[in-house]
Amino acid sequence: MTRTAPSSLRSLPAEGAAATDLLDTLQRGLAELDAQGLRRVRRTADTACDAHMRVDGRDIVGFASNDYLGLAAHPALVAAFAEGARRYGSGSGGSHLLGGHSRAHATLEDELAGFAGGFSDAPRALYFSTGYMANLAAMTALTGKHATIFSDALNHASLIDGIRLSRANVQVYPHADMAALAALLDASDAETKLIVSDTVFSMDGDIAPLAELVALAERHGAWLVVDDAHGFGVLGPQGRGALAAAALRSPNLIYVGTLGKAAGVAGAFVIAHETVIEWMIQRARSYIFTTAAPPAVAHAVSASLKVIAGDEGDARRAHLAALIERTRALLRMTRWQPVDSHTAVQPLVIGSNDATLAAMRSLDAHGLWVPAIRPPTVPAGTSRLRVSLSAAHSFDDLARLEAALIEASEGQTRRDAEQPPRSLRSLPPEGAAASLGAARRETAA
């Protein structure tokens, strides 16, 4: 009996042709990224995450990580990680619903709810392996075709991807524009309304108007989901986060936090009313269909919470606050445009990709790792250096950064002076000479 190939396969090109076509397409795409100065390159750390590291075989001062409290190499966390591995082994062995949920995970969830759940009368926490997975869960499990999501234009990519997967209607409001958001809410008759916002925006460092967001959510019967990835551990009393810093409480709140930044370990969590969390356990695909994080990680996070909430955490936050104010001042000494940020994220907007990469390379030559952030992470024309501060930094580190930034800024000024005006660069040589002569005559007159 002769079998006929499925119709979906009959139109495929000859063997190997499809693979070759794909490789050609990808190679052209990579070449375009190179031409635009947009290819990203990984650097390899040879030592623990800290202010002073060895990266790609060189000693550097790092201003790239999100280790805001300098806990990633803290002896107490390292010891707790080792203890957790001895007690629970190296892996969880399964998903949370199929054998992988350990006592370490359960204990951590209780601790997180008590630590950062003060905004709710009945808080419960759910631990995830990554912040990306936590945001996907919040967006997809709690919405659907019946819902409308109102999303800040500068929300993190993980929120945006979760929104796309949710199948909900989407309304994007201009960044932090509460009047625009109010108008969208007024016009909506959706059965379920979900307002979604970062607290600290990761590329600008500014903080969302949280009190106004809560008020709008309550006025319109909406839920408010806040992603406090860059605020948890740093903002508020004892580092309890952005909601605690603003003294906000509401039954309409859902709080997402991450544990690989200020907490110095890994993972993320969602805190909400216990009914919301129980529903997420039943319906959040990014929670259900993945192996649970190693219990040793959760055990180390429990140790981190003790440091964050204690006197040492207060001292680290105070030092970080002083570093932030000093950095704000030194960034204003360059030719570029600092963003008005009062958080550990201190961006310096340069503009073009080429100029931003040149500044990054200039700093790198001085042993300073300050990453260049380019599209699509930020809008075209706003490429920037992102100075990320840690309590592990010293004021001597900032003095080195200041000197190197001033040199990079002056170098850009010299390069600009050496180039002809933009209007002349595309002219042929004879036209350029004639136009330049005319310009000189006009100036002399």
Curated annotation (Swiss-Prot):
Disulfide bonds listed in the record: none
UniProt EC number: 2.3.1.47
Q: According to its UniProt record, in which pathway does this protein act?
A: Cofactor biosynthesis; biotin biosynthesis
Q: Which domain of life is it from?
A: Bacteria
Q: Name one GO biological process term.
A: biotin biosynthetic process
**Positions bearing N6-(pyridoxal phosphate)lysine:** 261
- Residues bound to substrate are 40, 156, 377
What cofactors does this protein use? pyridoxal 5'-phosphate
UniProt keywords, alphabetically: Biotin biosynthesis, Pyridoxal phosphate, Transferase
What Gene3D superfamilies does the record tag this protein with? Aspartate Aminotransferase, domain 1, Type I PLP-dependent aspartate aminotransferase-like (Major domain)
**Region of interest (Disordered), ranges:** 408-445
List residues binding pyridoxal 5'-phosphate. Answer: 131-132, 202, 230, 258
List the Pfam families hit by this protein, alphabetically.
Aminotran_1_2
Work out whether the entry's keyword set contains Calcium: no
The GO terms this record gives for MF are:
8-amino-7-oxononanoate synthase activity; pyridoxal phosphate binding
- Catalysed reaction equations from the record: 6-carboxyhexanoyl-[ACP] + L-alanine + H(+) = (8S)-8-amino-7-oxononanoate + holo-[ACP] + CO2
Q: Which HAMAP family match?
A: BioF_aminotrans_2 (MF_01693)
Q: What is the annotated role of this protein in its UniProt record?
A: Catalyzes the decarboxylative condensation of pimeloyl-[acyl-carrier protein] and L-alanine to produce 8-amino-7-oxononanoate (AON), [acyl-carrier protein], and carbon dioxide.
Similarity annotation: Belongs to the class-II pyridoxal-phosphate-dependent aminotransferase family. BioF subfamily.
Quaternary structure and partners: Homodimer.
NCBIfam families in UniProt: bioF
Protein name, entry field? 8-amino-7-oxononanoate synthase
The species this protein belongs to is Burkholderia ambifaria (strain MC40-6)
Classification of source organism:
Bacteria, Pseudomonadati, Pseudomonadota, Betaproteobacteria, Burkholderiales
Protein's gene: bioF
